[in-house]
Amino acid sequence: ARKSGGDIHLLVAGSNCTAAAQEAATLSGVSTVKVADAAHYQNQTAENLTALIIANAAGYSHILAPATTFGKNLMPRVAALLDVAQISEITGVDSQDTFVRPIYAGNALATVKSADAVKVITVRTTAFDAVNRENTAKIDSIAAAADTAQTTLTNRELTKSERPELGAAKIIVSGGRGLGSGENYHTLLEPLADKLGAALGASRAAVDAGFVPNDYQVGQTGKIVA
């Protein structure tokens, strides 16, 4: 966001999200944190968050989100309603309208220049250094958009692990179909991951074979980790 120029405003939407907003205000470079606190933002559905972003999009030249499952679900909706092209998974910023993104499963890099008035972008966060927390940004409350009631969350499964989260891990031990079975996967890879303090990952083939759950999957069809 800093490389794109201009003031940086951070949107926090949730239910009882004051603590999250205060934490966001400490991020270096952020000038204003805008907070929409309403019950229908608790489950972070893309439909409701899209309506909120569109209602507050006026005056912004760039709208960014991480290239996570969340961002990939949200930002295409935003781009479509603004009638602009989304720029996906950028790994570099050349100027305010020119960005670098991987193509062909990461085997090449494309430099993309956007002529749209508003740039809607997802960011591959592992390509950028984390900012420090030496800031006290202004926190403003904004009105919540109406509940679209288009989607209802019926269930959420939380996977708990003492290992690092895949998307943020510095070291990942990953295995594929060649391990032969889920038992071999755990027997061979877990001790190594324990020694290295690493996260565990797996190929799509290993996940499809049932060796591990799909939240272990890394790569083009899983979590992007490099």
Q: Language model features by range: what are they?
A:
Residues 2-226:
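N-terminal glycine-rich FAD/FM-binding segment characteristic of electron-transfer flavoproteins
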